[in-house]
Every structure is written in C-alpha cells, then in structure tokens.
Amino acid sequence: MNKKRVVIKIGSSSLTNEKGEIDHKKLGDHVNALAMLHQHNFEVILVSSGAVAAGFRNLGYSSRPVTLKGKQASAAIGQGLLIHTYMDKFMEYNIRSAQLLLTRSDFSVQKRYKNATSTMLELLERGVIPIINENDTVAVDELTFGDNDMLSALVSGSIHAAQLIILTDIDGIYDKHPGKYASAMRYDTIDLITNDMIQETDVSGSKLGTGGMKSKLMAAKVAASLGVPVFIGKGVGVSKLLEIVNGHGQGTYVRSFRNKQIPIRKQWISLHSTLEGKVFIDDGATQALMHNGGSLLSAGVINTQGDFEDGDVVEVYNRRNLLGRGQVSCSSEELNAANTLKKAKQMTQIPAIEVIHRDSWVMVDQIKEEFQ
C-alpha cells in the first residue's frame, strides 16, 4: 500500500447544476481541492463522471437524453469537453493531467488489465494526475461499471491506493433515509458492509435508502475487500480532501478488514477473469492448497470438467465444496494425459506437473460473489 496514494471519485451529481449540465464552478472547486492534495505530495487519481452532462446540449438535446444512443453520442462529444476543462483547470496549478477511458473488457482481459494498471502507475511516477472515466460511447449495458463507483473501487485496488474517496451530494451513510426521517443518524465509521445493508437500499424509506447509495456501498465493500479503506461523503472548500484523508471528513469512513492488499494477479483472478472449467482434487491436495501454502500438482487431481488451456482460470473443488479458483499452468488435455499415463503404468515415480502455482491461487473467501 502506498500511504500517499488516493483515488477520488466524483459523480455527475457533484458536477452538475439543476438542469443536468456541467457546473463549472463546482468542477473548479473540486480541482482546487485536488490540486491542494497534489501539492501536499499525495499521488492523486481522479475518477470522474460527467461526459454525458458535458455533451448533451451540443447535440441539441433540451435535457439529458434517456436513450442509449443519445447518451453515447452525448458522451462522445462531452468527454472531450470535460477533459479539456479539467486539463485547463489543473494547468492553472502547473499540474499535468491525462485521460484514461476504460471498459469492463479492459479488466476482463489480463494483459489489458496489467497494461492499464502499469499506465496509471507510470503517470503517477511522473507526477501526472490520471483522469479516468468509463468509455460510455462503446460500453454496453451488460458490461458497465455503474456510475463509476465500481470502477473507482477496482482502480483503487489495482494500484494499491491508501484510500478511496467517493464524493457525493450526501454527507455519508445513514441508518435511515435522512430526507424522510428526522431521527436518521449518520454512521461516522463502518467496520463491515453487509449484504443486508446493501439490500436495504432497495426498500423505499428504509435503512440507508438514499438514492444512488447502493452502488456506493457495493463499491466500498469491494474496495475494502481489496485492502482499501473508503470515505463516502462530501466536503466544502479547498482543504476538503486534506480534511478527509486526515480523518476529519463530512461523511462515513469504511474500514478495510484486510491487513494487506491483494496482488493484482489475484485481483484479476477473483474479480475479472472468465471461468473456463473445473478441477476436482483429493484430500491431500486440499491440505496443500488450503493450509500448507502449496501449489496444486497433477497428482492431487481426481477429475476435470471443461476444456481449458494454459493461462485459463478454473474453479477448484474437493469432494465436498468449492475451494477457490486459480490460473492453470497446463491445459486440461495435458493434465488428463498425465494422470491417464500414471494410472495405466501404475507408477508413482512419474513426475507430477504443476497445475496451479500458489501465486495464481485465490481461496473462496477472497472471491467477491456480489461483483460477478
């Protein structure tokens, strides 16, 4: 974890006016705070929505479009306008910034995931602020992050950030809808976001029932599971981000329950990879994987399901339960051939081949099913 590396997510509601257009004063206020954080030697990554809001007027829409083609066309115009505005504002502080547009498929393909992460780290090393947005123009409904909340969580995990700050127009997470219940109490800190808390946001007028909060809770849960603590709330003034990182923010702090962050290879395996098959193992291999810190060898494999190749990701089961998933070092054909040869010759001296290296193995408790 880099103690001075912070991801800040700014949503459309924190950038727009009552007409749904970009509010340049709001954007300028955010840049002022981001610049101050940068000047205090923090590495700053900005995840910003707002492309549609910046562009829809230029297409002749009187209000924010609701059709997919309208949104994507607006984003195509608006993203350029948005990034140009950000760059001009940052240059007032002699701070360079750069644009990265990402989609879910950039995370699902391992090489692209590594390249995106390497690019972000190189920009930070050079003192540049990466400005990240989902590539709305080409994204499809089935493969989106959802208002950039989840994107910010995944970015914070991949670059091993010290904190994720999700800025919103709500001053934190409440036990009830603060607009409907005068007795609503804000959580100053949350140790663990439960699925019950997330589901409650679907119930009108119930616990945490603030619009847009569900996606923020889901994102915070994923970030915390990756070892990144999260702040959800708002702030005022040029020092608002410094106040947040120093523990004095106007909102809710979500603690991470992990003492150390997860390597990016394991993040990709657990959160982004596509499953290509299943491997069933015996009790000895289970002991090696789950308790002894070992790798999975072919000698411990009982059976396989599906056709997979070297580098694919598979689920691993023992005789009773799902144990986890891993990136294989051999194909299903090679694995089955090795075990068939061993059985045919009834020999134990045939060298076992490595199926999953320990560094490419993720136990089931690290796999976030709510994100799949």
UniProtKB/Swiss-Prot annotation:
Its main location: cytoplasm. Substrate binds at S49, D136, N148. Residues 276-360 form the PUA domain. One of its GO terms (molecular function) is glutamate 5-kinase activity. Its EC number is 2.7.2.11. It is found in: Cytoplasm. ATP binds at K9, T168, D169, T210, G211, G212, M213, K214, S215, K216. It catalyses: L-glutamate + ATP = L-glutamyl 5-phosphate + ADP. Pathway: Amino-acid biosynthesis; L-proline biosynthesis; L-glutamate 5-semialdehyde from L-glutamate: step 1/2. GO terms for biological process: L-proline biosynthetic process. NCBIfam families: proB. This is Glutamate 5-kinase. It comes from Oceanobacillus iheyensis (strain DSM 14371 / CIP 107618 / JCM 11309 / KCTC 3954 / HTE831).
